[in-house]
């Protein structure tokens, strides 16, 4: 997938000679896993090899595998009697040891040419694309409860694309150089940050964990990677692939840990240079506050980047294509059980179209299969991730039953006897300000507000002001004037904004992802500028003509 085109010349730029190189990569194709296909046979074999087994996963500091006494287990969401992985939490002393070892390794890694670092990630991408694809997918399916297609788009193409495109952007960044002047040359050196980066990963995307740790490392940084407890198996597989691809020891430390212990330890280190985070708003705020409280101890101001979820909307105009609305909303709201940061959870429908859309949603709803994604590939989505998530969503379903403003029109049941299963649920609200339209649920729950069709301008204002989040949103008008009007009204309501398409499904290099407001710092991983976030540029001016006169001409 990598093709480098070298330009005809090389130019001397201060301390370095820069080759003008353009790197061509393409998005990794999504495989279909049809009956009888090679990829399906390989995946089924990988799933059989993991069935009923418990993987042992240590903390890894440098080349040392370390076990502590604080033992934990990752459970399969759809069969919580299956312990997918046995792992341990790093304690404060071990985390500090990891920091010390990382900082000691930083200088040599940072001085390595970016092209050499990039080749490690190109190789890792090729390994995931080829021989390790089935293994990483199988571990994502069993450990995180994903269906075949959801595991595929996450743990294969998205992760592969992160590695390849970020490597491409890192190499091409070297060509972004300042102007020279007569008698001198100017060079921009893209250094890593001075210190270490703490990467805090979520459960819902194997690719995000790999990117949170991988991109800072690619740019010359050393990283402490705290994987999610509920994505441990797939995360460890990605870590091992990076090491197999040539990543030196101590560049990424693999350190499962209790969240508060990890946060307290990294934010109290003078060497903290950055935090790369995906998770909840309360956790991100806690980390940010700890950084603020400790500013006086740091050698540098830490870079803090975070993505925190959303309360994503679908706005339907009276000119909408009904079938597109129904299909897009079902997929956005219920794929992976609504556990995507971009999932649609609030919908605004004009009264003139609601009967059609309602019936369309219910017709599809009856066909949705929720179950074991390993035993039945026709499953549309599986269980939610763990008992905490199940309890939280169950609480929202109970709220929907008791609220006078809410009516459950489909689903509403849940069962955690074998797995953490929640039915896809559609709720109608008569109050657009009801808290279910404001707060993130992170489950298969869609709430619909039906509005008078001529009040769509008021509804656009309502969408923009109802929720503190601003991650993704979609509008469904065929009327071009409404598309333009909505774009202005919702300019700040979503970092990823879709027109006549669902609010999920961003692709690396096509729709760089992220939002503002309570949704995060909107650094747009998957885009060309993301790598710059993890550099500390140095400008070097080298003068070739001796300076012989201290007086300025006007002084003559």
Swiss-Prot record:
Give the CC-aspect GO terms.
mitochondrial matrix
Task: Look up the transit peptide and give its residue range.
Answer: 1-17
> Where, in this chain's numbering, is NAD(+) bound?
226, 279-283, 440
Q: Which reaction does it catalyse?
A: L-glutamate 5-semialdehyde + NAD(+) + H2O = L-glutamate + NADH + 2 H(+)
Q: Does the keyword Nucleus apply?
A: no
Extract the CDD domains matched here: ALDH_F4-17_P5CDH
- Which residues does the entry assign to the active site, renumbered to this chain? 307 (proton acceptor), 341 (nucleophile)
Binding residues for substrate, per the UniProt record? 506
Site (Transition state stabilizer): residue numbering on this chain: 204
Enumerate the InterPro entries for this protein. Ald_DH/histidinol_DH, Ald_DH_C, Ald_DH_CS_CYS, Ald_DH_CS_GLU, Ald_DH_N, Aldehyde_DH_dom, P5CDH/ALDH4A1
GO:BP terms for this protein? proline catabolic process to glutamate
A GO molecular function held by the record:
1-pyrroline-5-carboxylate dehydrogenase activity
E.C. designation(s): 1.2.1.88
PROSITE patterns recorded for this chain?
ALDEHYDE_DEHYDR_CYS, ALDEHYDE_DEHYDR_GLU
Write out the similarity annotation. Belongs to the aldehyde dehydrogenase family.
So what does this one do?
Answer: Irreversible conversion of delta-1-pyrroline-5-carboxylate (P5C), derived either from proline or ornithine, to glutamate. This is a necessary step in the pathway interconnecting the urea and tricarboxylic acid cycles.
In Swiss-Prot or TrEMBL terms, this protein is called: Delta-1-pyrroline-5-carboxylate dehydrogenase, mitochondrial
Q: Which organism is it from?
A: Danio rerio (Zebrafish)
Q: Which gene encodes it?
A: aldh4a1
């Amino acid at each position: 997938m990598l093709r480098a085109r070298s330009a005809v010349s090389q130019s001397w730029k201060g301390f370095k000679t820069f080759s003008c190189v353009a790197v061509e990569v393409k998005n990794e194709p999504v495989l279909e896993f049809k009956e009888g296909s090679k990829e399906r046979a390989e995946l089924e074999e990988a799933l059989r090899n993991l069935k009923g087994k418990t993987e042992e996963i240590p903390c890894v500091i440098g080349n040392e595998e370390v076990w502590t006494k604080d033992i934990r287990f990752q459970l399969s969401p759809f069969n919580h009697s299956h312990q997918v992985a046995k792992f341990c939490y790093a304690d404060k002393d071990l985390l500090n040891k990891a920091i010390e070892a990382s900082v000691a390794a930083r200088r040599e890694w940072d001085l390595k040419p970016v092209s050499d670092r990039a080749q490690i990630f190109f190789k890792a991408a090729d390994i995931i694309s080829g021989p390790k694809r089935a293994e990483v997918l199988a571990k994502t399916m069993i450990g995180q409860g994903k269906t075949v297609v959801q595991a595929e788009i996450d743990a294969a193409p998205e992760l592969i694309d992160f590695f390849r495109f970020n490597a491409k952007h890192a190499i091409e960044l070297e060509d972004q150089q300042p102007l020279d002047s007569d008698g001198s040359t100017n060079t921009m050196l893209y250094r890593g940050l001075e210190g270490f980066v703490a990467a805090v990963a979520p459960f819902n995307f194997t690719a995000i964990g790999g990117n949170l740790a991988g991109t800072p490392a690619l740019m010359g940084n050393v990283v402490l990677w705290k994987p999610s407890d509920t994505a441990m198996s797939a995360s460890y597989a990605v870590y091992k692939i990076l090491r197999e691809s040539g990543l030196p020891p101590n560049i990424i430390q693999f350190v499962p840990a209790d969240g508060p212990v990890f946060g307290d330890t990294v934010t109290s280190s003078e060497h903290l240079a950055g935090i790369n985070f995906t998770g909840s708003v309360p956790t991100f705020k806690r980390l940010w506050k700890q950084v603020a409280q400790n500013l006086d101890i740091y050698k540098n101001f830490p870079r803090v980047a975070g993505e925190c979820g959303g309360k994503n909307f679908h706005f339907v105009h009276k000119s909408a294509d009904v079938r597109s609305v129904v299909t897009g909303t079902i997929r956005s709201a219920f794929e992976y059980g609504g556990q995507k940061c971009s999932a649609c959870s609030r919908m605004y429908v004009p009264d003139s179209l609601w009967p059609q859309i309602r019936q369309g949603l219910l017709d599809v709803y009856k066909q949705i299969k929720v179950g074991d994604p390993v035993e039945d590939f026709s499953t549309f989505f599986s269980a939610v991730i763990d008992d905490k998530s199940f309890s939280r969503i169950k609480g929202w379903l109970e709220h929907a039953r008791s609220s006078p403003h809410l009516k459950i029109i489909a689903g509403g049941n849940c069962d955690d006897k074998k797995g953490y299963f929640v039915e896809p649920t559609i709720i109608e609200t008569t109050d657009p300000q009801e808290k279910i339209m404001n707060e993130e649920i992170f489950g298969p729950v869609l709430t619909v507000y039906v509005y008078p069709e001529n009040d769509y301008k008021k509804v656009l204002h309502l969408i923009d002001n109802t929720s503190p989040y601003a991650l993704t949103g979609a509008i469904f008008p065929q009327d071009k004037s409404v598309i333009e009007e909505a774009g202005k009204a919702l300019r700040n309501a979503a970092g990823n904004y879709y027109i006549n398409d669902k609010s999920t499904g961003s692709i690396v290099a096509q729709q760089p992802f992220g939002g503002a407001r309570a949704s995060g710092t909107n650094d747009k991983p998957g885009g060309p500028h993301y790598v710059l976030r993890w550099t500390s540029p140095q400008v070097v001016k080298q003068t070739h003509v001796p300076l012989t006169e201290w007086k300025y001409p006007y002084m003559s």
